[in-house]
A protein has these predicted regions:
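A short SAM/SAH-binding and catalytic strip from SAM-dependent methyltransferases
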Residues: 59-71
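C-terminal alpha-helical "lid/dimerization" subdomain adjacent to the S-adenosyl-L-methionine
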Residues: 92-152
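Short glycine-centered segments of the SAM/dcSAM-binding site in methyltransferase folds
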Residues: 13, 86-88
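Class I SAM-dependent methyltransferase SAM/SAH-binding core
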Residues: 1-49
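A short glycine-rich, Lys/Arg-flanked "PGG" loop and its adjoining helix->strand segment in the class I
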Residues: 73-85
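C-terminal lobe and adjacent flexible extensions of AdoMet/dcAdoMet transferase-like proteins
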Residues: 153-159
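A short acidic, Gly/Pro-enriched loop at the edge of an enzyme's catalytic core
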Residues: 45-59
């Protein structure tokens, strides 16, 4: 939908990717309505198979993506591939609780949310395991975001 596009400074050149044409159209409408001249493109593309050359970007930002793609590791591999050495990968995602009543609620919701393509029980270990197996990725920040800590910000640097 391009919801995050206006949050970047106008000096930041942006390319947006989505597999959904209706979501891309909403982003195009937002770009036009808010005169976001720094958005260089909005492209229909699969996050697990990006058509960009290796090391194309200084930073890849993937908000609310990993819980909706079929293969989060393939998506993370693609993000790492298109980011230049020294560049960053920035994720914002809901990370499920690992224990307690919230974990039980998320597991229940997960059984019903799967048809929507969303996994409320998405565990951190999917990202953590990926980072551990990648010698070229370093986790530089991980923190819960307000409100209520429902989302987690993770920043990684590609060596």
């Amino acid at each position: 939908t391009g919801l995050e596009l206006p949050m970047f400074t106008r000096k930041t050149r942006l390319v947006g990717v989505d597999l959904s044409e209706p979501m891309l159209q909403r982003a195009r409408d937002r770009v036009q309505a808010e005169s976001l001249s720094n958005v260089e493109g909005l492209v229909k593309m699969d996050a697990m198979n990006l058509a960009f050359p290796d090391a194309s970007f200084d930073c890849a930002v993937a908000p609310y993506v990993l819980t909706v793609v079929p293969d989060p590791h393939a998506t993370l591999d693609e993000l790492a591939r298109v980011v230049k050495p020294g560049g960053e990968i920035v994720l914002v995602n809901h990370i499920g609780a690992e224990t307690g009543p919230i974990a039980a609620i998320e597991a229940f919701m997960g059984r019903h949310a799967a048809s929507l393509g969303w996994r409320p029980e998405f565990p951190w270990r999917i990202i953590g395991d990926w980072i551990e197996r990648r010698e070229d990725i370093v986790l530089t920040e991980r923190r819960r975001l307000n409100p209520l800590g429902l989302f987690t910000l993770a920043r990684m640097t590609r060596r």
